[in-house]
Amino acid sequence: MRLVGSEMCIRDRNIPDVRLLRPRTLIIHDNLKKEIFYIRNIYKDEKIRDYRKKFEEVKSDLFRLLIQSSIKNINNRTELKSRNIKVKSNTSKNRFLQMVNKAKEYIKLGDIFQVVLSQRFEAKLTKKPIDIYKKLRVTNPSPFMFFFNFNDFQIIGASPEILVRLRDNKITVRPIAGTRPRGKTLSEDRFYEKDLLQDKKELSEHLMLLDLGRNDAGKVSKINTVKVTESFIIEKYSHVMHIVSNVIGEYDKKFSKFKSLLAGFPAGTVSGAPKIRAMEIIDELETTKRKVYAGGIGYFSANGEFDTCIALRTAVAKKDKFYVQAGAGIVADSKPLKEYEETVNKAKALINALK
């Protein structure tokens, strides 16, 4: 995520702000229907004359791929060894606490109601990025799992949160705000869940971002169609639990698909409210550009639908480095140490995938 024209924090990694892909070949696995779709896009530059012949070639490629995949699954069993991971941050603990206090000053002055401040953790890359992704699928399964290999860097993610979705003419945003760690026992887990739902600070923060989500959905929905279908429910993941709500609206077709995406970008749950002033404060207080973190990852489909998630619980592997960024929502009564600990807890799932 980048604020146009702002250069207060440094760009320390050569990673693009945007990367768009238009693949020729797609393999779509529908896990609910237990079906696999193999799609081969044909473009004019290929100058194909016999499409039936091309179809048979593609089918042969698919069967060959299936055979190779089966062989790899049988012969490529590796033993995972536990490793001690040394982690450092781009922000010292004391500086992060100061960042929180400075944000609270801005809130007191009336500049903002809330802002999400983050820190970026860095560790040595101890295994292949694709192996980290495979481990995440087991240890931290999430609604959005993704792996992108751009040769000079890789993006690995297990995001819990929709950015904006258009499906069946319905716009969906699903704000997540409010966090507790998972308990070590069932009773401790229940304690944290109850504590989260009784925390006035967390509830007020979530309500604020839920209202922001309703406003975002309303920008590209038909009048009086926006509604909250889930409100203040708890979703649990491997290391943390969250308060989650769900907002839908009937898509107004006078808006383009791209405009619909921008209606919710960047998400208030990773920036703050009001968004623009919150982003200015983020740029002032954070030490390095966020880049992938808090941005959007997803697809636009040929059928006119799209689905995107927020780049949370997302790591970047570059050369021999592994980067994970995590944030916490700051409001008027935030406790700096508690917000610091929240960022650490959110980053644990990805850091532990290195072990």
What are these regions (language model features)?
Residues 6-7, 11-355:
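Extended alpha-helical targeting/anchoring segments
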